[in-house]
């Protein structure tokens, strides 16, 4: 499978929210408006007590045109809007997946690249012209991740940050297999995360 969040971890989180916190499944939305949720994940995370949990991805995400993202740095790119599933939410849980990445370590920060909509449905961050800012390793360099985390609707509503590090892909877009899930760098030294 491609490097999506582990459906077992997502399902466990959802069961905890419904079974222990008493949140109604229909009041829960899992979203990433830059990707597609695989059918197996949606099915696994909406069965039994989770029936009614919503999934919003690039096919059904709706831009809240009253909520454009205001970047603190001026650059050219598409206007970006938060999805209505974010602006209508009372709070967020940021569940990201650990994986190797050519842009360096971002953990939960880059997860919000799945939190905005613009004219490029396939790759909103490219439509926004954001990747250019992630390749620089210099101090005092602008990072759009800071703006996303500081956004009142994103960072301001986030009550929990979680990182799925159970079985991780070695890079973005890589399939997770027995061979690729073993990380070569320290401290893993050819073992699993």
Can you describe what each PLM-predicted range is?
Residues 2-193:
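Extended, low-polarity segments enriched in aliphatic/aromatic residues
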């Amino acid at each position: 499978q491609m490097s999506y969040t582990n459906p077992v971890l997502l399902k466990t989180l959802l069961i905890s929210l419904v079974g222990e916190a008493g949140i109604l499944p229909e009041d829960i939305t899992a979203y990433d408006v830059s990707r597609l949720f695989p059918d197996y994940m949606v099915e696994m995370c909406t069965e039994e007590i989770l029936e009614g949990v919503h999934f919003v991805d690039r096919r059904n995400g709706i831009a809240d045109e009253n909520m454009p993202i205001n970047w603190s740095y001026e650059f050219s790119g598409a206007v970006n809007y938060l999805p209505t599933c974010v602006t209508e939410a009372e709070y967020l849980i940021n569940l990201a997946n650990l994986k190797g990445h050519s842009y360096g370590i971002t953990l939960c920060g880059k997860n919000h690249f799945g939190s905005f909509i613009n004219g490029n449905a396939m790759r909103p961050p490219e439509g926004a012209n954001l990747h250019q800012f992630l390749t620089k390793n210099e101090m005092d360099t602008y990072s759009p991740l800071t703006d996303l985390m500081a956004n009142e609707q994103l960072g301001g509503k986030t009550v929990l940050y979680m990182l799925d590090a159970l079985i991780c892909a070695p890079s973005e877009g890589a399939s997770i297999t027995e061979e690729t899930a073993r990380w070569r760098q320290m401290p893993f030294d050819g073992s699993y995360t």
